[in-house]
Amino acid sequence: MEQYSPIVTETTFTITWKNYDGTVLETDTNVKKWTLPTYDGATPTKPDDTEYKYTFKGWDPEVKIATSDQVYTATFTSEKIISDEERYATKPIVSSDGKTIKYGLYPQTNVNDGTLVSTINALTSPESNGWYLHEGNYYAKAEAKPYKTTYTFDNGTPITKGETYWFRCEPIVWKVLSNKSGEYFILSSLLLDAHCFYNSSSDRTIDEKTIYANNYKYSDIRTWLNDEFYNSAFALGNNHIQLKAVDNSVGTTGGNNPTYVCEDTNDKVFLPSHKDYTTSSYGFSTGADTAISRYCKTTDWERARGSLSSSVGEDFPNQGAYLTRSPNSASFVAVWGVNTKGALRELRAYDKDSGVRPSISIKIS
């Protein structure tokens, strides 16, 4: 008697691969049960729109062994498209709550990506302000001269004296102190650099007048702010900055001694006065003693440049001491400053470890 073997039919399924919009990219028939389906076509794409660009991420649902007919749909990650205006803050960008404004660019955060550092180390053509452009981002380098050897960057890297580091140039965030019909008085929310008020304790004679070390009109910090800082921070856009008539009268100095008071100045960038830092409508404590409202954090760049920094508890790391434009009547080398605990105190004009917290007046129509 003739023997017959049973015919075994393999179970197979149809696997369909679709793009985000339902377009069929590939159809695989006869996919055997218990095997893992594979997509063999071109990588799925999704066109960028005005706000986002899209990159293929994977499939939904997650690809698993075949146990039934299945449709897989391509999924994508989205990345917000940043315009040059936003990336470089070439124009003022007001926050949704109106409390801060991004405007200008300055070195701030240490670059600790070894691959990126190797790449930008090879750059040889700096921009006019000394920064380097790589893949749409600006970088600046500096030889570290920390105030203390124990200082670190925000990423935890120790700051070693004499070593050269790279820093990413990022939009400056300004605190809005006042807004009068679109004319804003704004103050940097971080300490951006380290600089002395004047580089000597000696007085000098200009136009037959004795000029003391704490004279703001003839100070090194005023020159630096309106030259080097201004030309770097606003190299890509400065149309909104107003030339400001700066009041340097005795009433702005926190006292009534006119000995060291200088003439009013006209500036595009300037330091706030003692009076500014005790004005409640600007958000500051009216007293001169310790106040959180005057706390201000140092940037990585500023710490590397030699600024004093100190943590005030766990919640306020790397707070800095910074200059005002106001002379202190204690002596001809004394200026008012804000210490790391937010108190208005005497600083010496020639100290190079003072932080810089600039302010500007801008017009937004």
Residue ranges and their predicted role:
Residues 11-16, 99:
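Short structural boundary motif marking the start of a folded domain
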Residues 81-365:
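Collagenous Gly-X-Y triple-helix signature in extracellular proteins
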Residues 11, 35-67:
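Surface-exposed interfaces of beta-sheet-rich extracellular modules
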